[in-house]
UniProtKB/Swiss-Prot annotation:
Its main location: cytoplasm. This is Peptide chain release factor 1. The keyword Oxidoreductase does not apply. The gene is prfA. Pfam families: PCRF (PF03462), RF-1 (PF00472). GO terms for molecular function: translation release factor activity, codon specific. It comes from Cellvibrio japonicus (strain Ueda107). Belongs to the prokaryotic/mitochondrial release factor family.
Length: 360
């Protein structure tokens, strides 16, 4: 392992021991905020330091085995050779695990996220496919124990959605869905196609981590235009009876958000403000991170909706992710929500890029 990585691990070990000592001091125990912050730091350092101590012990065991091979009798040498073989086999996986523990944590990974699916080129077929994509994500969310709340939707004339916006809540939502932003292309024979010709259409997906609180983004109320209107689409008897739906326009940026799912105008307004804050924060972060690494831009997405990331080919039963040249012939399972075989390799590739950056 590189000396720079070992030096970093040694510093973390020293800090861990320092924090451990501080947590037993009376003045720290009596200061709730300080105690909470140190406890959090201790919990973050502990898995790294425990793994590092295991690594140091492994190195010590290797040296001990080598010493016995050089100095011991025949029986001892045979045992030591077996021990050395076992230790050396564990060395590389242990080093890799340590390096993974050192990877910077994405502060957004544990956040809920807004999921937007929009029909692109392809007319009615694109709208139908946007419905298929949203159903795919909803079923995947079920397997993860997440909750999906639809905030607004515009239905297609022949099914599906021109646009559907939802909030996905649960554990580690953004860490899994962050690889989904971009253009998704479908190749299939539409039900309305009498000649059996394959059509190509596309939908765009945007995934944005939910802003923690509105305070994260400075929103001047004078910059907002707020309109109320009657909700449309499915929703029961209350639809079209009250102006409960909310549309908020952020005049400086032109961002428009809507929420029509809740029966209460107050709740719709709160949801719309949260979505607006998230969009503004995402815009600010994209502007601040223009120098982001090419690898991360390719995998997590640049926010450019025209960036084609995946093709769903129905005649061949094929799903291809163009960012990592991944091809799977399990389209039916993927569309039923079995996304792990797609998301897993993307996450692994992303992690490999980060590890390469550490090694540089």
């Amino acid at each position: 392992m590189k000396s720079s990585i070992l030096e970093k691990l040694e510093r973390l070990k020293e800090r861990y021991e320092e924090v451990s000592a501080l947590l037993s001091e009376a003045d720290v125990i009596n200061n709730q905020a300080r105690f909470r912050d140190l406890s959090k730091e201790y919990a973050e350092l502990e898995p790294v330091v425990v793994a590092y101590k295991g690594y140091l012990q492994l190195l010590a065991d290797i040296e001990e085995a080598k010493h016995l091979i050089a100095e011991g009798d025949a029986d001892m040498r045979e045992m030591a050779e077996e021990e050395l073989e076992g230790c050396e086999a564990r060395l590389e996986p242990t080093e890799l695990e340590l390096q993974k523990l050192l990877l910077p944590k994405d502060p957004n990974d544990e956040k809920n996220c807004y999921l937007e699916v929009r029909a692109g080129t392809g007319g009615d077929e694109a709208a139908i496919f946007s419905g298929d994509l949203f159903r795919m994500y909803s079923r995947y969310a079920e397997t993860q124990g997440w909750r999906v709340e639809i905030l607004s939707q515009s239905e297609g004339e022949h099914g599906g959605f021109k646009e559907i916006i939802s909030l996905v809540s649960g554990s580690g939502v953004y860490s899994k869905l962050k690889f989904e932003s971009g253009a998704h292309r479908v190749q299939r024979v539409p039900e309305t196609e009498s000649q059996g010709r394959i059509h190509t259409s596309a939908c765009t997906v945007a995934v944005m981590p939910e802003a923690d609180e509105l305070e994260e983004v400075n929103i001047n109320k004078a910059d907002l235009r707020i309109d109320t209107y009657r909700a449309s689409g499915a929703g029961g008897q209350h639809v079209n009876k009250t102006d409960s739906a909310i549309r908020i326009t952020h005049i400086p940026t032109g961002i428009v958000v809507e929420c029509q799912d809740e029966r209460s105008q107050h709740k719709n307004r709160a949801r719309a403000m949260s979505l607006l804050a998230t969009k503004l924060k995402t815009m600010q972060e994209e502007a601040a991170h223009k120098s982001i690494s090419e690898e991360r831009r390719n995998l997590v997405g640049s926010g450019d909706r025209s960036e084609r990331i995946r093709t769903y080919n129905y005649p061949q039963g094929r799903v291809t992710d163009h960012r990592i040249n991944l091809t799977l012939y399990s389209l039916d399972a993927v569309m039923q929500g079995d996304l792990e075989p797609v998301i897993g390799p993307l996450a692994n590739e992303y992690q490999a890029d980060q590890l390469a950056a550490i090694a540089d």
